[in-house]
């Protein structure tokens, strides 16, 4: 197991509430897969709390740089709630989106046997720009 640490990456939009979470989420998910000696396909779904479309795209790009392709099993709660129609590029509230999706459709699908192996990584901004 890795020691706890702070992940901070240089980026074009450091004050965006979602993009700072993406490098930390990438590090966490990469470490989890390594620790479990697993591949993304070993899970039914891998879900982040609320990176929104912008942060989710960055997460997938960062992990592809490490030869990890989450795209077949990856979803983001903020992106699921807001979709493409609402123009919420960076999603909403990490804790709100996480709770709504985890306690709603994800746990319901687990209870019904549609999801057996789930990775849920709570993400979202913890900052006040």
Describe the function of each predicted region.
Residues 8-9, 39, 85-86:
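A short alpha-helix capping/helix-coil boundary motif
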